[in-house]
Amino acid sequence: YYTRDIRNFRLKAGMSFEYYDYHSDLFGQNGNRLSPSSDHFLNYFVSCTMDTYDRLYYPTHGSRIQIQGFVHTDNGILYDDDTPFGEVVIHAETALKLNRRFYLLPSLKSRLLFGNSIPAIYQNCAGGSSDANYLPWQMAWETVQHVHLLERNVITGRLAFRYRVKGKFYFTASG
């Protein structure tokens, strides 16, 4: 793939090959077990990230916005003899200084799917305490154990407060 850094921007473009061998571990949204099969995908992607944070860890001001676009095919042109399906992923977060000890950290994530037939492996899913625990596009959802399939379009928000105790020691509360 191709990567280019221009000041606070990072641009990426490329293609990837993915192969999935499904067993009987996947379930549809109606609760029925999906039939075992295998799929291969030839995917194209573009990504643009703007990062103005002052620090990599515990930033005090700035923002990070990432926009990604994907087109999924099975032969490089079509998917299942039809038009390919796609997705757009947006992740935006910022650090706002309220005073010398308190910081407000809002965040917004979304994943939008487009197309006629989207296989179960690329459906939106959520669960666990961290992003990308089982699948790269899995969104964290503290109250959900394991992984659950979601609707085609998902938008989530998070608001966190950070308190600097002393020096490099912080407490963060998020919800």
Give residue spans per PLM region.
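Edge/loop elements at the starts and ends of beta-strands within beta-rich repeat scaffolds
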Residues: 4-8, 39, 55-60
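Generic preference for flexible, low-structure residues
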Residues: 18, 22, 27-31, 64, ...
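Transmembrane beta-barrel wall of Gram-negative outer-membrane proteins
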Residues: 1-33
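Gram-negative (and chloroplast) outer-membrane scaffold detector with strong preference
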Residues: 1-3, 168, 173
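Generic alpha-helical structural element
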Residues: 2-3, 37, 148
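Aspartyl protease catalytic domain
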Residues: 34-36, 41-44
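C-terminal outer-membrane beta-barrel translocator/porin domains of Gram-negative envelope proteins
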Residues: 44-49, 53-166, 171
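A charged, amphipathic alpha-helical module
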Residues: 28, 32-34, 48, 54
